[in-house]
Curated annotation (Swiss-Prot):
Recorded family membership: Belongs to the globin family.
Leftover remarks: This fish has two hemoglobins: Hb1 (major) and Hb2 (about 5% of the total). They display the Bohr and root effects.
One GO process term, biological-process aspect: hydrogen peroxide catabolic process
One Pfam short name: Globin
Tissues where the protein occurs: Red blood cells.
Keywords: Heme, Iron, Metal-binding, Oxygen transport, Transport
PROSITE patterns: GLOBIN
GO cellular component term of the entry, any: haptoglobin-hemoglobin complex
UniProt cross-references to InterPro entries, sorted A to Z: Globin, Globin-like_sf, Globin/Proto, Hemoglobin_b, Hemoglobin_oxygen_transport
Protein name: Hemoglobin subunit beta-1
């Protein structure tokens, strides 16, 4: 079980209370698909992913980015038991979708980068530490079924 300080919980809750899901989600998933093109294989049904412009303008990518970002709400609501909160999604991604668990870390990094760009100076080292700790726990939970 992960131990969260009051400061970490405050920072994480503050980030999510101001998060623009419709902006951050599409940008983060688009970045992941552009920077790590091999991740596109899981999105073959999304239509044109031929280049960066097509990915950024793809409505399916945008919608899934929003869905993924809202998926983090599950962890936020279950900070004391994130692993169990993501057990079903871990099984889905490992057994049905066959997603390489390393892709969770790649997307996590992209979410962090987009969030940092959005928050600017407000994305302090302390904010980054708390957010990346949260994301690392979520990534670990999503990869749990693979172990």
């Amino acid at each position: 079980m992960v131990k969260w300080s009051k400061t970490e919980l405050t920072i994480i809750n503050d980030i999510f209370s101001h998060l623009d899901y419709d902006d951050i989600g599409p940008k983060a998933l688009s970045r992941c698909l552009i920077v790590y093109p091999w991740t596109q294989r899981h999105f073959s049904g999304f239509g044109n992913l031929y280049n960066a412009e097509a990915i950024i303008g793809n409505a399916n990518v945008a919608a899934h980015g929003i869905k993924v970002l809202h998926g983090l709400d599950r962890g936020l609501k279950n900070m004391d038991n994130i692993v169990d909160a993501y057990a079903e999604l871990s099984t889905l991604h490992s057994e049905k979708l066959h997603v390489d668990p390393d892709n969770f870390k790649l997307l996590s990094d992209c979410i962090t980068i987009v969030l940092a760009a959005k928050l600017g100076k407000a994305f302090t080292a302390e904010t980054q530490a708390a957010f990346q700790k949260f994301m690392a726990v979520v990534v670990s939970a999503l990869g749990k079924q693979y172990h």
